[in-house]
Amino acid sequence: MNLHRLTVFAPALLFLALLASCAINRCPTLPGGVSYCLQSPASGPSFSAVQQVVIGEGGQQETLLAYIENNPQRLALVGLSPLGQTVLRVTWDGEQIVASGPPGMGPPVNPAVLVAVLQFGLWPADAVRAGLPENAVWKDGATNGQLSCQGKSLLTLHRTGQAVPYDTLSVTLQPAELLINMHTLTEETCCGVDTAP
């Protein structure tokens, strides 16, 4: 194989090797330096939802259509591009987090961080606190939540709606200014387009 081909295919091969090894840390370090150990699917609510997910960082923005399901055995997330291509598939069974995507295309955000964000937004507050180190503080109200460490805000969230998976969930992770906005689609909406009469 010549050097040019190796240069072109090396990133894709590295990404596939990482996926094949299932070497995703179940205790990811969030922007700001605090680690969070993912909690079991059984400690969260059972639900399924179709959501429009917008991920923004550093002026760049990715939009996905996500199918998310949680039950006592596993959390599963499938992310589709606006054109319908599967760009991310993540499963978490309480022991191992596995992610896959098309060759040569990395996920828009660390899959373990994405699962952590879902847990901060949707899991009971006590379950979230169980995954945090002692110096981190998680405050969770009906519509707002905040993670802080040593007086610094690291994650803020706002949700609307009465029950999981909520109508909207907006999360900001500092200091990276990583924004994740999730909007639950209903039978009246499809792909962000209102189809109600």
In which residue ranges do the predicted regions lie?
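C-terminal motif of bacterial Sec signal peptides marking the signal peptidase cleavage site
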Residues: 18-21
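Post-signal-peptide N-terminal segment of Sec-exported extracytoplasmic proteins
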Residues: 41-76
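Envelope-exposed proteins and targeting segments
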Residues: 73, 93-95, 143
